[in-house]
Amino acid sequence: MRPNQRLYLQDILERILHIEFCTSGGRESFLNDRLLQDGVILAFMVIGEAVKRLDSQAIEGRPEVAWSDYAGFRDVLIHRYHDILLEEVWQFSQEDLAALKTAVTELLNDLENSDAPT
């Protein structure tokens, strides 16, 4: 893997945990709290940017994750910020984060194991 891959993976994992925290109060709480909304939106922006920087070899081995969806969602959030539908952000936060979290955790573990002395 290229340098900084661990940092990108750690960024993704940290942002997933942040999204989980911000959405733990439920849909209504999220939809009524601008601070929570902004936190989740920013976290998705970071996830999408970090996904774009990951080695294609690493993510191709994890087809259960729709990696390009995260990169594309980031682009929508950045370039069409005035059209953001909070219901879509909520749905995105509830649907596939578990698979992404699992894949990122496995990739980080793979890096740890490859760095371990033999």
Region annotations inferred by a language model:
Residues 1-118:
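Solvent-exposed interaction patches of small proteins and small membrane subunits
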